């Protein structure tokens, strides 16, 4: 059965956890763990602070595999283009798909900020039409997932696509931290990488599909995860 190993992290919130990221990456590279892709599931920087990107670039330059990321809520949408220009080593996916051919395995990746079932107060106040934007994004993600053709399928999504990941956070705010409406989206993939919930669960399974919360403040480390084809339906019994 085909499989790949990936390294994954998120919620660096530079400068807040930048030193931790630097130290953990150095440790990872010293151990010579083999991985084929490096994933960052959003929030590289804190509150849109683009001045931190040069520091991120200096740290990640030692990574010699493709670096794929989605944006988080701290990478403000109006700054996406500038972030892409300032971080040429990172391939950012914003409701987009990417196909990587690695060791004769076709890895299909969809990346997105994700959706909230209820926009936050700040979002409702500062982003006109945010609820409609989330509905349209959800539709696009389902459309992309249906069209994705690959040996292995990976979803990178900053906001958790299930409240189960949020357990450990204040349940009062679950609807403003993730989306249960995207739970069915998970079934299209072999692995889901999410973040945002610094006090959430590290790993949950949804209909047999693993959802890893790779938030750096939660894990205190960069995770090495194996992605393999998930057997579905009757296949799972044989």
Predicted regions and their residues:
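Short, electropositive alpha-helical surface patch
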Residues: 57-64, 164-180, 206-218
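Conserved catalytic scaffold of divalent metal-dependent phosphoesterases
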Residues: 12-14, 78-172, 215-216
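Charged helix-capping and loop-helix junction motifs
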Residues: 22-24, 51-59, 86, 90, ...
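N-terminal active-site segment of His-dependent metallophosphoesterases
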Residues: 1-65, 76-78, 146-152, 238
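Binuclear metal-dependent phosphoesterase catalytic core
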Residues: 2-3, 98-103, 132, 183-188, ...
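Active-site neighborhood of phospho(di)ester-bond hydrolases with catalytic His/Asp-centered motifs
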Residues: 8-10, 38-43, 67-73, 91-95, ...
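Basic, amphipathic N-terminal segments that precede the first structured/catalytic domain
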Residues: 10, 53-60, 66-89, 98-100, ...
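Active-site environment of divalent metal-dependent phosphoester hydrolases
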Residues: 13-19, 45-50, 73-81, 97-101, ...
